Amino acid sequence: MQVQKSFKDKKTSGTLYLVPTPIGNLQDMTFRAVATLKEVDFICAEDTRNTGLLLKHFDIATKQISFHEHNSYEKIPDLIDLLISGRSLAQVSDAGMPSISDPGHDLVKAAIDSDIAVVALPGASAGITALIASGLAPQPHVFYGFLPRKAGQQKAFFEDKHHYTETQMFCESPYRIKDTLTNMLACYGDRQVVLVRELTKLFEEYQRGSISEILSYLEETPLKGECLLIVAGAQVDSEIELTADVDLVSLVQKEIQAGAKPNQAIKTIAKAYQVNRQELYQQFHDL
């Protein structure tokens, strides 16, 4: 067990700060984020050119270290050594929260394993920002990040998730969005979705409707800009209707194959299909 007192413990090691950056509007940069980036010894940036423009705008002279998904494995030991020596680092992504669909998690884990304080600053996050204005249920929700690009893998992903009752969020390219929605329609049915593009920018847009309605709209209005896709969770109208043609035990076995423990898998499927957990437990163990 580890207990971190972020601002009270005086250690000889430095601190790793996770600093969010604007997702499109520079006015969303917080005072605390600017102050932190000025005070740390180094800034670990996903793209030093992109971050360089941000630093110039806010008159921040702190030196950058390139840190992205292609060099993180070799960079992390050196960054941990800097932290252990007493240097403080800030980690930023190109936009939004570090570690969310961006590099950072492995560095955080390595810092924690080395008993180095990790402090996250609040700020811009595309997923939460889009969700609360979407009109779909904000909780429970799950954010999956970027979808598989290959059609077969994407369809398998949707088949595995179509029964989830949570609101689901995905990142997607404007060049793939129509194919993605077509695959989703085949697996999820024509449920409600919200397509969000150019979040916080001048041309911010929310497209709200059924999957088929959004597809029809996109045929007439080509999409530009990176987008977020928010999908309503599966609706449970009747336990009998929902489970009549579903092999719940097989779904439990799939959850276990994916790494879940048996009891957790049973709980997940029972909740998703609104069936009695004890009855499903008995069915599973009677096999």
From Swiss-Prot:
GO CC terms: cytoplasm
Which InterPro entries has this protein been placed in?
4pyrrol_Mease, 4pyrrol_Methylase_sf, 4pyrrole_Mease_sub1, 4pyrrole_Mease_sub2, rRNA_ssu_MeTfrase_I, SAM_MeTrfase_RsmI_CS
Bilayer-spanning residue ranges: none
State the SUPFAM superfamilies in the record: Tetrapyrrole methylase
Cellular localisation: Cytoplasm
The UniProt function text for this chain reads:
Catalyzes the 2'-O-methylation of the ribose of cytidine 1402 (C1402) in 16S rRNA.
Query: Which protein, by its recorded name, is this?
Result: Ribosomal RNA small subunit methyltransferase I
Taxonomic lineage is: Bacteria, Bacillati, Bacillota, Bacilli, Lactobacillales
